[in-house]
Amino acid sequence: MSSFTKEEFDCHILDEGFTAKDILDQKINEVSSSDDKDAFYVADLGDILKKHLRWLKALPRVTPFYAVKCNDSRAIVSTLAATGTGFDCASKTEIQLVQGLGVPPERIIYANPCKQVSQIKYAASSGVQMMTFDSEIELMKVARAHPKAKLVLRIATDDSKAVCRLSVKFGATLKTSRLLLERAKELNIDVIGVSFHVGSGCTDPETFVQAVSDARCVFDMGTEVGFSMYLLDIGGGFPGSEDTKLKFEEITSVINPALDKYFPSDSGVRIIAEPGRYYVASAFTLAVNIIAKKTVWKEQPGSDDEDESNEQTFMYYVNDGVYGSFNCILYDHAHVKALLQKRPKPDEKYYSSSIWGPTCDGLDRIVERCNLPEMHVGDWMLFENMGAYTVAAASTFNGFQRPNIYYVMSRPMWQLMKRIQSHGFPPEVEEQDDGTLPMSCAQESGMDHHSAACASARINV
């Protein structure tokens, strides 16, 4: 169990009745009289802890190894490190981040089947032994650069119903798997298990069943070749928000029987997974400011009366876009929905609108068409469920900086964090509803709080 590290955040415990939305509104109010209305995030670390409790309940046999690539914010990684999760790292830099927070190498899997030789050597020097492969060339690289590695064979799956398909690029077929196991034996490289990934944003839970069945076949092949394999990695693909068609428990209700059938609890096989968006998607809300506006008139045929026959539409330009947080639209096939920071009047008219990012690229469009009341320069829009594959891949194209992140946590979750820090993760903790609970806020960058509203504390996160 990792304790909290030396990377410190000032934390403020708010009085009862304050919520994450209050923190967001407070920040907006603080900058309302300023010209610097930069985009920013509010991220609920308590939501991440609740996700972990939910995981333990829904998949009790499966140890999560958080996919750092999904969101590599230090506060996120540190919070998960404190809960005892493992970490799926894809590069030297991610390994450095995780180990820099005190995570031991046995809680890391280098889950990239195609690695640079220098980074394989770095993994060896840092004590990271578990790593994936799916080709003979990778086997030979590892044999030379890290002969003591504990290899996990990545197999291909049917990910045709996933939002982001991965098996086109990664994974060995069942036929190739036997050849690779035989080659690993010749090279005297230890293969300890099998991994797969059904694709990010999986929409068919039955895909997991077939993949687990295929993994069983490869385990049997390993036994025939002479390996004693003991690790099954079921990858990711778990939803991270409640606006998806397929719910988390719908997936786990299919996975658990498959695991019990093909890898029963007395089989001696350790089971891990690589959830990313599951942990962080719903924890992040992004606030963006309207920096420019354009009115467009769409002429209707058969009339010369502009006021009555022409349709008015609006183009809004905000201070984050597809080169920043909304890269998820291009790379993660995300569909985002703009929410209003101010509640519209009941009789307010709505107009066809589009939302654009701040860069000079015409591709920088966030929402092609939506209905909004007329808004103005200086108004704010909110986007929920923005924690997955957003900040990690954001660039500073055109000189636009990444948004600051402000962290919040409910008092019960804060108290749980303190217990973890002192005594480790308590297995008997139940999920808690934070709907009306007091909130606390940790800052990653420069947010002041009114002293009357909160008590100051310090947490090593």
From Swiss-Prot:
Binding site for pyridoxal 5'-phosphate: 200, 237, 274-277, 389
Signal peptide: none
Reactions this protein catalyses: L-ornithine + H(+) = putrescine + CO2
Spans traversing the lipid bilayer: none
GO terms for cellular component: cytoplasm
Cofactor(s) named in the record: pyridoxal 5'-phosphate
List of residues binding substrate: 331-332, 361
GO molecular function terms noted in the UniProt entry: ornithine decarboxylase activity; protein homodimerization activity
InterPro entries the UniProt entry points to: Ala_racemase/Decarboxylase_C, De-COase2_C, De-COase2_CS, De-COase2_N, De-COase2_pyr-phos_BS, Orn/DAP/Arg_de-COase, Orn_de-COase, PLP-binding_barrel
Phosphoserine found at: 303
Chain positions found as S-nitrosocysteine: 360
Active site: 360
Residues flagged as site, Stacks against the aromatic ring of pyridoxal phosphate and stabilizes reaction intermediates: 197
Metabolic or biological pathway, per its Swiss-Prot or TrEMBL entry: Amine and polyamine biosynthesis; putrescine biosynthesis via L-ornithine pathway; putrescine from L-ornithine: step 1/1
Modified residues (N6-(pyridoxal phosphate)lysine): 69
Keywords for this protein: Decarboxylase, Lyase, Phosphoprotein, Polyamine biosynthesis, Pyridoxal phosphate, S-nitrosylation
EC id: 4.1.1.17
Regulation: Inhibited by antizymes (AZs) OAZ1, OAZ2 and OAZ3 in response to polyamine levels. AZs inhibit the assembly of the functional homodimer by binding to ODC monomers. Additionally, OAZ1 targets ODC monomers for ubiquitin-independent proteolytic destruction by the 26S proteasome.
GO biological process, one term: regulation of protein catabolic process
Gene3D superfamilies according to UniProt: Alanine racemase (3.20.20.10), Lyase, Ornithine Decarboxylase, Chain A, domain 1 (2.40.37.10)
Family in the record: Belongs to the Orn/Lys/Arg decarboxylase class-II family.
Function as written in the Swiss-Prot or TrEMBL entry: Catalyzes the first and rate-limiting step of polyamine biosynthesis that converts ornithine into putrescine, which is the precursor for the polyamines, spermidine and spermine. Polyamines are essential for cell proliferation and are implicated in cellular processes, ranging from DNA replication to apoptosis.
Subunit structure of this chain's protein: Homodimer. Only the dimer is catalytically active, as the active sites are constructed of residues from both monomers.
Stated name of the protein: Ornithine decarboxylase
UniProt organism field: Mus pahari (Gairdner's shrew-mouse)
